[in-house]
Amino acid sequence: MARHKRKRRRDVNPILLVIVLVLLLANVVVFLRREGRSLPGEGVRLPDYVTADYLVKNEWSRPGTPLTKINGVVIHDVGNPGTSAQANRNYFNGLALSHETSASAHFVVGLKGEVIACVPLTEVAYASNERNADTVSIEVCHPDETGEYSAVTYERVVELTAWLCGTFDLDVQEDVIRHYDVTGKICPKYYVEHPEAWEQLKADVEAKMAP
Protein backbone atom coordinates (compact mmCIF):
# COMPACT_ATOMS: atom_id res chain seq x y z
CA MET A 1 0.00 0.00 0.00
CA ALA A 2 1.48 3.27 -1.07
CA ARG A 3 2.07 5.79 1.62
CA HIS A 4 1.21 9.39 0.95
CA LYS A 5 3.86 11.65 2.31
CA ARG A 6 2.42 14.44 4.29
CA LYS A 7 3.67 17.75 2.94
CA ARG A 8 5.48 19.73 5.53
CA ARG A 9 3.93 23.11 6.06
CA ARG A 10 6.39 25.94 6.00
CA ASP A 11 5.73 28.48 8.70
CA VAL A 12 5.88 32.09 7.62
CA ASN A 13 8.33 34.09 9.65
CA PRO A 14 6.16 36.74 11.33
CA ILE A 15 9.05 39.20 11.57
CA LEU A 16 9.72 38.94 7.84
CA LEU A 17 6.03 39.43 7.13
CA VAL A 18 5.95 42.59 9.23
CA ILE A 19 9.00 43.98 7.42
CA VAL A 20 7.42 43.35 4.01
CA LEU A 21 4.17 45.01 5.07
CA VAL A 22 6.01 48.04 6.45
CA LEU A 23 7.96 48.44 3.20
CA LEU A 24 4.80 48.19 1.12
CA LEU A 25 3.05 50.75 3.29
CA ALA A 26 6.03 53.12 3.05
CA ASN A 27 5.96 52.91 -0.76
CA VAL A 28 2.24 53.67 -0.79
CA VAL A 29 2.76 56.73 1.43
CA VAL A 30 5.58 58.04 -0.79
CA PHE A 31 3.44 57.55 -3.89
CA LEU A 32 0.48 59.37 -2.39
CA ARG A 33 2.67 62.26 -1.28
CA ARG A 34 4.12 62.62 -4.76
CA GLU A 35 0.71 62.51 -6.36
CA GLY A 36 -0.76 65.10 -4.02
CA ARG A 37 2.17 67.42 -3.49
CA SER A 38 1.75 71.11 -4.25
CA LEU A 39 3.89 73.29 -6.48
CA PRO A 40 7.04 74.59 -4.76
CA GLY A 41 5.84 78.19 -4.94
CA GLU A 42 2.34 77.43 -3.67
CA GLY A 43 1.45 79.09 -0.40
CA VAL A 44 4.66 81.15 -0.29
CA ARG A 45 4.03 84.61 1.13
CA LEU A 46 5.88 87.41 -0.65
CA PRO A 47 8.02 89.82 1.41
CA ASP A 48 6.36 93.06 2.47
CA TYR A 49 8.53 95.11 0.09
CA VAL A 50 7.08 93.26 -2.93
CA THR A 51 3.93 94.56 -4.64
CA ALA A 52 1.96 91.87 -6.47
CA ASP A 53 0.68 93.33 -9.75
CA TYR A 54 0.25 90.20 -11.82
CA LEU A 55 -0.03 90.24 -15.59
CA VAL A 56 -3.27 89.18 -17.21
CA LYS A 57 -3.13 85.57 -18.31
CA ASN A 58 -2.19 85.35 -21.97
CA GLU A 59 0.01 83.23 -24.21
CA TRP A 60 2.63 85.96 -24.75
CA SER A 61 3.72 86.82 -21.22
CA ARG A 62 1.77 84.80 -18.65
CA PRO A 63 0.68 81.48 -20.10
CA GLY A 64 -0.29 80.00 -16.72
CA THR A 65 2.01 77.00 -17.13
CA PRO A 66 2.70 75.44 -13.70
CA LEU A 67 6.24 75.95 -12.38
CA THR A 68 6.77 72.45 -11.02
CA LYS A 69 10.43 72.92 -10.02
CA ILE A 70 12.46 75.83 -8.68
CA ASN A 71 16.12 74.99 -9.12
CA GLY A 72 17.59 78.46 -9.56
CA VAL A 73 17.30 82.22 -9.82
CA VAL A 74 18.17 84.00 -13.07
CA ILE A 75 19.17 87.68 -12.97
CA HIS A 76 18.52 89.95 -15.97
CA ASP A 77 18.68 93.66 -16.71
CA VAL A 78 15.78 95.35 -18.47
CA GLY A 79 18.00 96.74 -21.23
CA ASN A 80 16.18 100.08 -21.44
CA PRO A 81 18.03 102.54 -19.18
CA GLY A 82 16.07 104.87 -16.93
CA THR A 83 12.76 103.03 -17.12
CA SER A 84 10.81 102.13 -13.99
CA ALA A 85 9.69 98.79 -12.65
CA GLN A 86 6.07 99.73 -13.37
CA ALA A 87 6.86 100.66 -16.98
CA ASN A 88 8.53 97.31 -17.57
CA ARG A 89 5.70 95.44 -15.89
CA ASN A 90 3.22 97.29 -18.11
CA TYR A 91 5.25 96.41 -21.19
CA PHE A 92 5.01 92.71 -20.33
CA ASN A 93 1.28 93.06 -19.73
CA GLY A 94 0.81 94.86 -23.04
CA LEU A 95 2.20 91.90 -24.95
CA ALA A 96 -1.21 90.28 -24.51
CA LEU A 97 -2.45 92.77 -27.12
CA SER A 98 0.65 93.70 -29.13
CA HIS A 99 1.92 90.12 -29.66
CA GLU A 100 5.32 91.72 -30.23
CA THR A 101 7.27 88.94 -28.55
CA SER A 102 7.06 86.46 -25.69
CA ALA A 103 8.61 87.96 -22.56
CA SER A 104 8.05 88.42 -18.83
CA ALA A 105 9.66 87.89 -15.43
CA HIS A 106 8.54 86.88 -12.00
CA PHE A 107 9.90 90.10 -10.47
CA VAL A 108 11.04 93.53 -11.64
CA VAL A 109 13.28 95.54 -9.30
CA GLY A 110 13.07 99.29 -9.88
CA LEU A 111 15.40 102.27 -9.72
CA LYS A 112 14.19 103.17 -6.22
CA GLY A 113 14.32 99.63 -4.87
CA GLU A 114 10.65 98.93 -5.50
CA VAL A 115 9.78 95.35 -6.46
CA ILE A 116 6.80 94.28 -8.55
CA ALA A 117 5.76 90.64 -8.80
CA CYS A 118 4.51 90.13 -12.36
CA VAL A 119 4.04 86.36 -12.47
CA PRO A 120 3.16 84.15 -9.48
CA LEU A 121 5.84 81.79 -8.18
CA THR A 122 3.56 78.90 -9.13
CA GLU A 123 3.78 79.75 -12.85
CA VAL A 124 6.42 79.86 -15.57
CA ALA A 125 7.65 83.26 -16.78
CA TYR A 126 9.06 83.83 -20.28
CA ALA A 127 12.54 85.07 -19.42
CA SER A 128 15.30 82.47 -19.53
CA ASN A 129 14.73 80.20 -22.52
CA GLU A 130 15.12 76.53 -21.60
CA ARG A 131 15.50 77.46 -17.93
CA ASN A 132 12.00 78.95 -17.82
CA ALA A 133 10.77 75.56 -16.63
CA ASP A 134 12.74 75.46 -13.38
CA THR A 135 13.85 78.96 -12.40
CA VAL A 136 12.59 82.23 -10.94
CA SER A 137 13.51 85.30 -13.00
CA ILE A 138 14.38 88.80 -11.78
CA GLU A 139 14.52 91.74 -14.21
CA VAL A 140 16.46 94.70 -12.84
CA CYS A 141 16.15 98.36 -13.84
CA HIS A 142 19.33 100.42 -14.31
CA PRO A 143 19.89 104.16 -14.70
CA ASP A 144 22.26 104.20 -17.68
CA GLU A 145 23.80 102.26 -20.56
CA THR A 146 26.49 100.65 -18.39
CA GLY A 147 23.85 98.43 -16.82
CA GLU A 148 25.25 98.96 -13.34
CA TYR A 149 22.57 99.01 -10.66
CA SER A 150 22.09 101.96 -8.36
CA ALA A 151 22.99 101.35 -4.71
CA VAL A 152 19.36 101.05 -3.58
CA THR A 153 18.49 98.75 -6.48
CA TYR A 154 21.54 96.60 -5.81
CA GLU A 155 20.63 96.16 -2.16
CA ARG A 156 17.10 95.13 -3.09
CA VAL A 157 18.34 92.60 -5.65
CA VAL A 158 20.59 91.11 -2.98
CA GLU A 159 17.71 91.02 -0.49
CA LEU A 160 15.22 89.46 -2.91
CA THR A 161 17.71 86.88 -4.17
CA ALA A 162 18.66 85.92 -0.61
CA TRP A 163 14.98 85.48 0.25
CA LEU A 164 14.41 83.25 -2.79
CA CYS A 165 17.46 81.13 -2.01
CA GLY A 166 16.38 80.72 1.59
CA THR A 167 12.78 79.94 0.69
CA PHE A 168 13.59 77.33 -1.95
CA ASP A 169 16.79 75.93 -0.44
CA LEU A 170 19.06 77.09 -3.27
CA ASP A 171 22.84 77.28 -3.28
CA VAL A 172 23.95 80.81 -4.13
CA GLN A 173 27.16 79.85 -5.91
CA GLU A 174 25.54 77.12 -8.01
CA ASP A 175 21.93 78.20 -8.44
CA VAL A 176 22.06 81.99 -8.84
CA ILE A 177 22.95 82.66 -12.46
CA ARG A 178 22.88 85.35 -15.13
CA HIS A 179 20.82 85.25 -18.32
CA TYR A 180 24.24 85.10 -19.96
CA ASP A 181 24.94 81.76 -18.30
CA VAL A 182 21.89 80.27 -20.01
CA THR A 183 22.06 81.70 -23.53
CA GLY A 184 25.29 83.69 -23.88
CA LYS A 185 23.33 86.94 -24.19
CA ILE A 186 25.15 89.93 -22.64
CA CYS A 187 22.63 90.22 -19.82
CA PRO A 188 22.85 91.56 -17.18
CA LYS A 189 25.33 93.70 -19.12
CA TYR A 190 27.39 95.17 -16.30
CA TYR A 191 27.71 91.86 -14.50
CA VAL A 192 28.80 90.04 -17.65
CA GLU A 193 31.40 92.68 -18.50
CA HIS A 194 32.56 92.82 -14.87
CA PRO A 195 32.65 89.22 -13.61
CA GLU A 196 34.26 90.33 -10.36
CA ALA A 197 31.17 92.45 -9.66
CA TRP A 198 29.01 89.40 -10.26
CA GLU A 199 31.03 87.34 -7.79
CA GLN A 200 30.70 90.17 -5.27
CA LEU A 201 26.93 90.24 -5.74
CA LYS A 202 26.72 86.53 -4.96
CA ALA A 203 28.97 87.01 -1.95
CA ASP A 204 26.65 89.76 -0.73
CA VAL A 205 23.67 87.43 -1.16
CA GLU A 206 25.43 84.81 0.95
CA ALA A 207 26.22 87.42 3.59
CA LYS A 208 22.57 88.48 3.63
CA MET A 209 21.53 84.90 4.29
CA ALA A 210 24.02 84.38 7.11
CA PRO A 211 22.40 84.06 10.56
Model regions: which residues?
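N-terminal catalytic cores of peptidoglycan-degrading enzymes
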Residues: 2-128
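Basic/polar, cationic surfaces and motifs that engage anionic cell-wall
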Residues: 2, 8, 12-18, 31-51, ...
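Short acidic/His/Gly/Ser-rich catalytic and metal-binding motifs that mark active-site loops
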Residues: 127-129, 185-186
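Soluble periplasmic/extracytoplasmic beta-strand elements of cell-envelope proteins
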Residues: 74, 108, 137-139, 177
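Short, low-complexity, polar/charged sequence segments that are solvent-exposed and flexible
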Residues: 92-98, 126-128, 135-138, 155-159, ...
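Cell-envelope and extracellular/periplasmic
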Residues: 79, 131, 136-145
